[in-house]
């Protein structure tokens, strides 16, 4: 078998393989002999069919099978011997086969790029320094009360955190526009659901009033025909409601799993949950900066096949979130996911190189700690730990997460790390905004 490897373009490779005619004939003869022992042809006993007849009837089928098998096996041997690492499915390109002659075919594919990490010491990371304070716990308790609040009719003016029911009709230069009209629209104020100026225009008015609000659509508004346009909304304010917050009674507190129903017990549980969230948020913030710096410091040739594969993963994930199936997933526009897929491939390649070059292995203690941390958020942590330990796929996911953490720590060891004091709310907002 003769093998040649050449670069087509960038990460593209072409392997050309020549299979000697003798090897093909030997394999064909062997398969025909096997077939002769089992084929049934009228007029002949099983295993006594003449070879010439077996060859006449099954020769072409056997030849095709042999060529397909030889192409695959020889290609695998060739890439192992030449230490080539393909990405994605290879594209086989056979030449015309002529009986008695050597068979030539080529295989085209992409390879993973060779990566030499550089400038890791130039990566800058700001590590948040945060503690959960009493006032943070107070704010979280207030949030819990708001989530459990009841809405009561209000006779006074609309305030920033009220809820209103309105009819509205929008127009631009006197002309109505699509999506600008609604009746009995319920709006909880202060959540940023409407365009700038809409909620502000409601504040100070009372139920039963009719008035007009002037607004300007943002330049980055999703509807092209409305970007930057000035509009007027005719408002009929039908109802104003305000929250009636529940008191921190024993009954209320027990809803959150606090057996003794005490305020101290609730505060302790809330603080514990906030500290767990804080730990994850700090880890996420630091990791995000490390990865951003890693990508910025290292240019990587990206295999198109790897990006294509990642796009399909993202398509399926998006479809699953909205209850779609496999067919619907692949109909989603690929360009929606291309940039995200490309970045994920780049990050995977770079972190993979950090792991390989430092010969990192997932540490058992870290894997256990990650599982324990996830389990601590559930009512019965031991049950969750057991579930993870019995599921090999979940365990592999945790091991990969542990390896990523170890890789990030390896980069941090040489990065420029500074500390910055901040507060719980600011950090959580930063993490949520990405």
Curated annotation (Swiss-Prot):
What the entry says about domains is:
Consists of 3 domains; the N-terminus binds the ribosome, the middle domain has PPIase activity, while the C-terminus has intrinsic chaperone activity on its own.
What is this protein's name? Trigger factor
InterPro entries xrefs: PPIase_dom_sf, PPIase_FKBP_dom, Trig_fac, Trigger_fac_C, Trigger_fac_C_sf, Trigger_fac_ribosome-bd_bac, Trigger_fac_ribosome-bd_sf, Trigger_fact/SurA_dom_sf
EC number(s) reported in the record: 5.2.1.8
Q: Cytoplasm among the record's keywords?
A: yes
State its location(s). Cytoplasm
Q: Which Pfam families match?
A: FKBP_C, Trigger_C, Trigger_N
Keywords for the protein's UniProt record, in alphabetical order: Cell cycle, Cell division, Chaperone, Cytoplasm, Isomerase, Rotamase
Record-stated family: Belongs to the FKBP-type PPIase family. Tig subfamily.
User: What gene does this protein come from?
Assistant: tig
PROSITE patterns documented for this protein: FKBP_PPIASE
NCBIfam families assigned to the protein according to its UniProt record, in alphabetical order: tig
User: In which organism is this protein found?
Assistant: Proteus mirabilis (strain HI4320)
Q: Which GO biological process categories is it annotated with?
A: 'de novo' cotranslational protein folding; cell division; chaperone-mediated protein folding; protein transport; protein unfolding
């Amino acid at each position: 078998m003769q093998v040649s490897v050449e670069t087509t373009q960038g990460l593209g490779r072409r392997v050309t393989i020549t299979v000697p005619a003798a090897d093909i004939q030997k394999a064909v003869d062997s398969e025909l002999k096997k077939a002769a022992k089992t084929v049934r042809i009228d007029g002949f006993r099983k295993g006594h069919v003449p070879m010439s007849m077996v060859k006449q009837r099954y020769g072409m089928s056997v030849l095709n099978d042999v060529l397909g098998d030889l192409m695959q096996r020889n290609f695998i041997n060739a890439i192992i011997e030449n230490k080539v690492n393909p990405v994605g499915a290879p594209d086989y390109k056979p030449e015309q086969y002529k009986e008695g002659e050597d068979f030539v075919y080529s295989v085209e594919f992409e390879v993973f790029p060779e990566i030499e990490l550089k400038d890791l010491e130039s990566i800058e990371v700001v590590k948040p320094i945060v503690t959960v304070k009493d006032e943070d716990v107070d704010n979280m308790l207030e949030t819990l009360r708001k989530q459990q609040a009841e809405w009561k009719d209000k006779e006074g003016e609309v305030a920033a955190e009220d809820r209103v029911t309105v009819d509205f009709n929008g127009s631009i230069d006197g002309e109505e526009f699509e999506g600008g009209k609604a009746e009995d629209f319920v709006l909880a104020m202060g959540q940023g659901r409407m365009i700038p100026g809409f909620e502000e225009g409601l504040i100070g008015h009372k139920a039963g009033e009719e008035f007009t609000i002037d607004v300007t659509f943002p330049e980055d508004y999703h509807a092209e025909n409305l970007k930057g346009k000035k509009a007027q909304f005719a408002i009929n304010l039908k109802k104003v409601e305000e929250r009636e917050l529940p008191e921190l009674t024993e009954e209320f507190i027990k809803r959150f799993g606090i057996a003794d129903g005490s305020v101290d017990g609730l505060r302790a549980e809330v603080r514990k949950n906030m500290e767990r969230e804080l730990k994850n948020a700090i880890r996420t913030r630091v990791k995000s900066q490390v990865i951003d710096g890693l990508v910025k410091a290292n240019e990587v040739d990206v295999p198109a096949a790897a990006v294509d594969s990642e796009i399909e993963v993202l398509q399926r994930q998006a479809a699953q979130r909205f209850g779609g199936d496999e067919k619907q997933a692949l109909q989603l526009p690929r360009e929606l996911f291309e940039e995200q897929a490309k970045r994920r491939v780049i990050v995977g390649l770079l972190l993979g190189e950090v792991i390989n070059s430092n010969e990192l292995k997932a540490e058992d203690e870290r894997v256990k700690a990650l599982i324990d941390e996830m389990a601590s958020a559930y009512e019965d942590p031991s049950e969750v730990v057991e579930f993870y330990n019995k599921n090999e796929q979940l365990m592999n996911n945790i091991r990969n997460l542990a390896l990523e953490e170890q890789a990030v720590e390896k980069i941090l060891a040489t990065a420029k790390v500074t500390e910055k004091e901040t507060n719980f709310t600011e950090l959580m907002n930063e993490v949520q905004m990405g």
